[in-house]
Amino acid sequence: MKTRFFALAALALSLAACTQDEPADDNRLPEGEYPVVIRATGLSVEATPQAAPSTRATVDGDWQGVQTVALKMGDAVKEYTVTATDADGYKSATLSRENDPHYWTSRDPITVSAWWPFNKADITQMPAVKVAEDQSKLADFQNSDFISAENRKVEFNNPTLEFTHRTARVTIELKPGTGFTSVAGATVSLVSLSA
């Protein structure tokens, strides 16, 4: 009788030990259970002395109008959906992927890169920055905008990724002043620019 009791007690303990779904002590997580979802920030517009007319993301410092980004984790690059709301003026966004997302494999920080725009024919490569020489047309200005977050650490408990512009927005306003009654015919050149 005692042997049967101890055998049942041992069986009950072993079954109870197998029902825990908690991660192991080494920070590992169950495979395929924790999709990578990231809060994207950054894109602030610096030094804007006057209210400029709004164009579209990201040149105005917000995520409005950006629908997807390329997100690289390890060697794999996947297209992630951008969800932004006006609750914070579109200043932050959630990057997520419904089907086949990247997954956390542990609670340790991960290193990711992300960029927009990207070439759908080859999403694996961050495109070279190409800006229109003449950006006086709105479409040329907008198509010269590139944002990225390169090789950034993302924490499991606070998955935030700060993006920055890969290009600079420069606005030059010419005004007549002392010795100049008109700026008609003036030419402006920016020199010594680099990537």
List PLM regions with ranges.
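Sec-type signal peptide cleavage vicinity
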Residues: 2-11, 15-195
